[in-house]
Amino acid sequence: MTESNRLRIAIQKSGRLSTDSQQLLKSCGVKFSINEQRLIAHADNMPIDLLRVRDDDIPGLVMDGVVDMGIIGENVLEEEQIERQTLNKPADCLKLRQLDFGSCRLSLAVPTEFSYADASSLEGLRIATSYPNLLRRFMQQKGITYRDCMLKGSVEVAPRAGLADGICDLVSTGATLEANGLYETEVIYRSMACIIQSTQTQTPTKQALIDKILSRVNGVIRARESKYILLHAPTETLDQIVALLPGAENPTVLPLNDDTNRVAIHAVSTEDLFWDTMEQLTALGASSILVMPIEKMMG
């Protein structure tokens, strides 16, 4: 395999997104090991190189065609796209799909003593943020003028330090805000991790590998969202039991040895089977109910 046909994928060097990205690729059958002292990891079984970089470098590397694919938070991607559009730099990439991890929200927050009605309450005030472009777009859409205070980290301490009147920062549980005497007022952007691809023309070999990886990602995520359900059911309540299985399509119904009054049902459900549903199934005569995770799915 020539160097030009090796697929280059950028992932975050460290942090939760890095861990989840590595796990996703391994679930897709990509075998690799990470040396913390090196920025590049070579896959053992596929022509794939993983570049471990800062998260805010990933969109630019993909947009400039330095790497072929990247796994990145949508918030970081959109922040970079707005910045590049402002500077008339290449800002295009293909967003292949949203992933099932990296959930976060970008929110406005103010000190607990601040009387907040809506975003207009921040008119003319100073707001600290690490996402100036997303904040600017939101405030422009609202017709609100403000002063910004750009910080690369520890945004939540800005009001207490006298640097800003409020903040715009990523929020998960809100515990950090509370610890710093702040409260969340408004969500301006919701984000998940996503896979992006360079818009530059790929060789047929490399594009085939991209398509293979994406197909496997789709299968892994579909499997995570599904459960395999097995149970025994009386034939007289079969239709009612099948109707109770959440998200199940065309379950397999098999006869049981030496029992003409009961059957075995196998089904893939796209929703969780909650305890109350299992109790309803039991009330209809179902028994030996098993709900199991699915590792992989295809087709």
UniProtKB/Swiss-Prot annotation:
GO terms for biological process: L-histidine biosynthetic process. Its cofactor is Mg(2+). PROSITE patterns: ATP_P_PHORIBOSYLTR (PS01316). InterPro entries: ATP-PRT_HisG_long (IPR020621), ATP_PRibTrfase_cat (IPR013820), ATP_PRibTrfase_CS (IPR018198), ATP_PRibTrfase_HisG (IPR001348), HisG_C (IPR013115), N-reg_PII-like_a/b (IPR011322), N-reg_PII/ATP_PRibTrfase_C (IPR015867). One of its GO terms (molecular function) is ATP phosphoribosyltransferase activity. Keywords: Amino-acid biosynthesis, ATP-binding, Cytoplasm, Glycosyltransferase, Histidine biosynthesis, Magnesium, Metal-binding, Nucleotide-binding, Transferase. It is found in: Cytoplasm. It comes from the Bacteria. It holds the Pfam family HisG_C. It catalyses: 1-(5-phospho-beta-D-ribosyl)-ATP + diphosphate = 5-phospho-alpha-D-ribose 1-diphosphate + ATP. Gene3D superfamilies: 3.30.70.120, Periplasmic binding protein-like II (3.40.190.10). Pathway: Amino-acid biosynthesis; L-histidine biosynthesis; L-histidine from 5-phospho-alpha-D-ribose 1-diphosphate: step 1/9. Feedback inhibited by histidine. GO terms for cellular component: cytoplasm. It is an enzyme of class 2 (transferase). Its EC number is 2.4.2.17. Catalyzes the condensation of ATP and 5-phosphoribose 1-diphosphate to form N'-(5'-phosphoribosyl)-ATP (PR-ATP). Has a crucial role in the pathway because the rate of histidine biosynthesis seems to be controlled primarily by regulation of HisG enzymatic activity. Belongs to the ATP phosphoribosyltransferase family. Long subfamily. This is ATP phosphoribosyltransferase. It comes from Shewanella baltica (strain OS155 / ATCC BAA-1091).
